[in-house]
């Protein structure tokens, strides 16, 4: 949802864009002990931020329940949430969505509330 990385660079310029990425196996697949780890589908997430305040202009997920994750975060993005806002949230564990609020470098934003 929001801008892709390419769209954000085109709109704001490369120097204004910072991306955060994560790839992991969804915890749901932990119950499948008969599957090889390499066979378990990966979830990929990307957060695209703009400017010094790192306003979130794009969130992207490929993986299980991506639609459910993005629905809630959509409100935050529309309201102008920053990476620091995401960093300041308590992660609901165990969920895949928690990755957005613990995305490395977690807590390293210039301004955590």
Task: Describe the predicted segments one by one.
Residues 1-4, 9-113:
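Flexible, glycine-rich terminal cap/loop adjacent to redox cofactors
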């Amino acid at each position: 949802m929001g801008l892709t990385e390419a769209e954000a660079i085109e709109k704001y310029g490369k120097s204004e864009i910072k991306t955060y990425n994560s790839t992991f196996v969804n915890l749901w697949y932990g119950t499948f002990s008969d599957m090889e780890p390499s066979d378990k589908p990966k979830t990929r997430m990307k957060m695209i931020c703009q400017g010094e305040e790192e306003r979130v202009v794009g969130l992207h997920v490929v993986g299980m329940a991506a639609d459910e994750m993005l629905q809630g975060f959509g409100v935050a993005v529309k309201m102008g949430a920053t990476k620091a806002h995401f960093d300041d949230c308590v992660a609901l564990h165990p969920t895949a969505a928690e990755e957005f609020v613990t995305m490395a470098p977690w807590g390293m934003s210039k301004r955590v509330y």
